[in-house]
Amino acid sequence: MIEAARWIIWEASQLLGAPSASIHDLYMARGRGEVSGFTVPAVNLRTQVFDMAGAMCRAAASLDAGTIVFELARSEQEYTYQRPGEYITSVLAGCIGAGWRGPVFVQGDHYQFNAKKYAADPEAMTEEIRRACRLAMEAGYRNIDIDSSTLVDL
């Protein structure tokens, strides 16, 4: 039943012009100097995701802004008890409810390596990150921030 509801929201987002999308092409165009003059806010919605995503879309529309990244870090998934499927469904539903038209950028934020786990078993830690990425991509995320900064000794 839950999967059916998620599927309905996913399909509605596609049909209503608010699909989950990768921000890659926009960033590449920006790097080539083809677009400029704007910033891209990235917001981590930890609670009231449906309401907050809708509020972000309404605010963006009122400013004629077209790009927002909705993020949820792996650590936030744990303490907010939100899995990728729940998060993206709430974001997309909030965007649809706000009348948003345009790509919806949902990102798995700071999929971070644990230095102690990596030192003990690099392959197991790497597989943990791979698994987290697979779950997010299967849920519909199109952007993942893999953070290996913890493995560098400055």
What are these regions (language model features)?
Residues 72-74, 108-110, 146-148:
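A cross-domain feature marking catalytic cores of carbohydrate-active enzymes
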Residues 112-154:
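Helix-rich catalytic cores of soluble enzyme domains
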Residues 1-105, 115, 131, 141:
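Alpha/beta catalytic barrel-like cores
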Residues 56, 109, 136:
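Conserved, mostly hydrophobic/aromatic
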